[in-house]
Amino acid sequence: MSCIADHKQAFTLSSLLSSDLITFLHSDTREDILFELSELAAKAGLLEDREAFFRALLARESIMSTGIGMGVAIPHGKIEGSADFFVALGIHSKGILWDAIDGLSVRLVFLIGGPSDAPSKYLKLLSALTQSLRDEARRSQLLQVQTVEEVMRVFSGV
């Protein structure tokens, strides 16, 4: 099951998350984590060109860190010709340096991929995601989960 949403339809965060795009991260650098999450999306059949998407993520990070604070990063890349958005989630047990705006290490990485021609839909997705992650209890729950199924329960109904 893939976690995609057609950018012409409404979405919920729970509709964008699926078990095949959630992982417990083992990498200890931002670049390696971006690669790991890109690979996850490619294996789920969401990327025709994983390498190009990965390079786009690195280019975006070089402009400005996507570490939004609160232990969260939301890297994102645009995919030419894509009709769908997807969200991949990586959870890191210890946290890594990400040059986040609050200086804290990052433990939750939400990778967004989607069409380059749907900026308003992307902003709605980003807004919904950041609003959801402002909930300290939800972030705390995500940091305590042990299984992908537990992650899915945290986002049920969101």
Predicted regions and their residues:
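Cytosolic covalent-transfer regions centered on His/Cys nucleophiles
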Residues: M1-V158
